[in-house]
From Swiss-Prot:
Binding site for GTP: 66-73, 151-155, 205-208
Top-rank lineage group of the source organism: Eukaryota
Transit peptide: 1-24
Keyword GTP-binding attributed: yes
A single GO molecular function term of this UniProt record: translation elongation factor activity
Protein's name in the database: Elongation factor G, mitochondrial
GO cellular component, one term: mitochondrial matrix
Protein family (similarity comment): Belongs to the TRAFAC class translation factor GTPase superfamily. Classic translation factor GTPase family. EF-G/EF-2 subfamily.
Source organism: Schizosaccharomyces pombe (strain 972 / ATCC 24843)
Domain tr-type G: 57-353
Amino acid sequence: MLKLSFRSLTSRLPRLSTLVVRGYASVANTGIEASNTSENNLNIQEQLNDNDKKRLKQIRNIGISAHIDSGKTTFTERVLYYTGRIKDIHEVRGKDNVGAKMDFMELEREKGITIQSAATHCTWERTVDQIEANEKQKTDFEKSYNINIIDTPGHIDFTIEVERALRVLDGAVLVLCAVSGVQSQTITVDRQMRRYNVPRISFVNKMDRMGADPWKVIQQINTKLKIPAAAVQIPIGQEDKLEGVVDLIQMRAIYNRGSKGEKIEISQQVPENLIELAKEKRSALIEKLADLDEEIADIYVMEEDPTPEQLMGAIRRTTLARKFTPVLMGSALSNVGVQSVLDAVCDYLPNPSEVENIALNAADSEKPVSLVPSSEKPLVALAFKLEEGRFGQLTYLRIYQGTLKRGNYIYNVNSTKKIKVSRLVRMHSNDMEEIEKVEAGGICALFGIECASGDTFTDGSVSYTMTSMFVPEPVISLSLKPKSKDTTSFSKALNRFQREDPTFRVQLDNESKETIISGMGELHLEVYVERMRREYKVDCETGKPRVAFRETLSKKVPFSYLHKKQSGGAGQYAKVEGYIEYMDGVEDESGNVVDCEFINKVTGGTVPTQYIPACEKAFYEALKKGFLIGHPIKNCRFVLEDGAYHPVDSSELAFRLATISAFRTAFLQANPMVLEPIMNVSITAPVEHQGGVIGNLDKRKATIVDSDTDEDEFTLQAEVPLNSMFSYSSDIRALTKGKGEFSMEFLKYLPAPKYVQKELVDAYNKQQQK
């Protein structure tokens, strides 16, 4: 008999829909209410023919995401092996020096980390036992599934790879370490999944390690990630004796046998020493679902035991609604539990017809349009990743609607260019398979087409566009100079890297004439410098890393500026009046923050309309280089209210110069300040080194915001100025005898201390005087 909870008796939640809404910003912005999603799902299904319905039911587009070193790429390697995609298993840092299939870059195999996201396609044949169980329960299922997988980096410096993968995927597997649990990048990935409304299942990996604690990890998912979670399995054995899992839904034992865990042995008998734990965790699963799903709540109130079919249905509904994540467990390295995750991907993650994707109709005032994954509808596809391949630029596409065929002409809605599809391929890491067509719901790649990441392609019959992904701002820069005089290869490399990676920026410093590259961290820039050497044979000298400071104002200041120049012939005359003030940043439809704006409040024609764009352009140009230390200005609103002009001497140039001078004068009177980037730093190390680590952080002016200590190790979360974090890699190694690790990501900008601002201003003024 099940124990009743007051919460379950009193809460009567409506049944959750099985449609995932992937709006161009959020559900609220699309005008589609969550309560109407079942109706929208019905509309999508009605527009699909029988062949499309069957085809789509067999497709899963998933990403595999995790904190660095959680075993994500090792897990993907097992998936490829068990699905028959590769013939043997190679480890990330294996002794055979082959490396994991999905880490195909030489640098990835040397460093043992994933740098670029890699795509592959595999087919999962359900186990005979699983097929029989589903048939017995009359579950709606398929015997084989086509799974498109994107393996993403775990390091925060390459977070854009996760962003663009999640933008086009329907579901995800979140891999967590059974020892470390929820870490800093886990929280970042969770935030990205929420941004793109991606349902996820969770896999607690490394259950074979000493100190593995899946229950702590599940508690952290509930509390730190704030998404209800419960185990659907418990482990059989611990550490090096791990041999399988107990399936809490079917109440049976699943063992991995064979030298590589390829043989599945299923027993209806749960090991005696685990029966009580299995009952306890199954009850916890049911109680959690009863709080989230009406059908299970009804069963719970009646004190009945739900059937496996009812449990699976509830898990699917709540997972698709992003109200719940089922937690599986095992060890990819020990070949335990991976096949169960593949079954869960098929059982609980959505197929393309269960995800509503929204486009904007450029021909109809950008009204939102719900796309239908029908092979017969007009083509709509999104370019989500660019890569330089052996045969030219490789463009990855997600097909949202229609069919893309080799030999067809397609239209780039963003550039209005017409392009012929000469080669169509399906990627398997860095290998390619030629294909003739890709239907809605599929992922493919094209060769030799000029486009940008985020461009939308159609067959020309519609003018739909899909918003691009969120692109974080770079936080670190350094100067770069080729050692040789071969600037052609240098320029080629920089142009290519900018096209491939929106977070990698290049600019020329007009004063020093240096090339400045900017990115998400030291490792990010280090990788590109090394790739330039290896792939383009260009050795570079690099300067000291620079922090991406910003400038802002702290009070509202009016301006009135007259630009007047008379030197014979045509003169220059322009007057602008208004004010500047501080503004908070607001998110746009793509999730990017807009923190500066120009507002025109001119009435009566005192500034003719033809000169307003020149004023606006001048303001945005001036923002690029501030007046305190030459860094970009943020959080600033420029309001133009009045002005004056001369019928002969006024021009766009005159109003441009007047605007820049007015802005400069007002900005310097508005109590300007320097902002410095604050990083969210996560550190894990053995407990005996905790004092030294905290002392070192204190010297770096860190603010510790959270800490967690286990028997053997501790984890700290701290907010630290990026300017204080240089050389920290060396320090943490020395402080912890090589046993500590850390990660950091940009958190926010805060005013720099006065002494830091004075140093920066003095250095900038000194440089200007040279």
